[in-house]
């Protein structure tokens, strides 16, 4: 282990201490190690260039002019990346969607960036996990000749 000294401004130190208290860390070192690990994992996920799976989460105002149509067009244009979507009505105007994606990391990021940039999308986050590409396989189905 290495001993490291860092300098933090008062506001950042206050926020760190709040995290330590909320999560029950025994000391600041444990919290900083965990935060460093999270940052390293996030950076690795963001720079992944190979195949991955991911979850794209975003909220949007469905009453914004043409937004639902634009989102649908984007999903049809990127149909090869999208595996499933869950749609939730948060209130009269706001919707939450969670979409499971599968493909090249840069393509997933490009797709997510396009969705998040649409006017009326209020929050967006893409979480990716490196994964092996699926193997191509054939399906053989037996059919009853009498049907």
Swiss-Prot record:
Pfam families: NikR_C (PF08753), RHH_1 (PF01402). Binds 1 nickel ion per subunit. Keywords: DNA-binding, Metal-binding, Nickel, Transcription, Transcription regulation. The keyword DNA-binding applies. GO terms for biological process: response to nickel cation. Its cofactor is Ni(2+). Ni(2+) binds at residues 76, 87, 89, 95. Belongs to the transcriptional regulatory CopG/NikR family. Transcriptional regulator. This is Putative nickel-responsive regulator. The lineage of its organism: Bacteria, Pseudomonadati, Pseudomonadota, Alphaproteobacteria, Hyphomicrobiales.
């Amino acid at each position: 282990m290495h001993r490291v000294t860092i300098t933090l401004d008062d506001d950042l130190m206050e926020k760190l201490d709040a995290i330590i208290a909320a999560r029950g860390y025994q000391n600041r070192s444990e919290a900083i190690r965990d935060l460093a690990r999270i940052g390293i994992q996030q950076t690795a996920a963001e720079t992944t260039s190979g195949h991955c799976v991911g979850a794209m989460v975003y909220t949007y105002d469905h009453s914004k002019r043409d937004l639902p149509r634009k989102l649908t067009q984007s999903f049809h244009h990127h149909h090869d990346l999208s595996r499933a979507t869950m749609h939730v009505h948060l209130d009269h105007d706001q919707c939450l969607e969670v979409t499971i994606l599968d493909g090249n990391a840069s393509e997933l990021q490009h797709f997510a960036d396009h969705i998040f940039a649409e006017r009326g999308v209020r929050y967006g986050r893409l979480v990716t996990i490196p994964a092996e590409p699926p193997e191509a396989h054939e399906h053989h189905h037996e059919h009853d000749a009498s049907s």
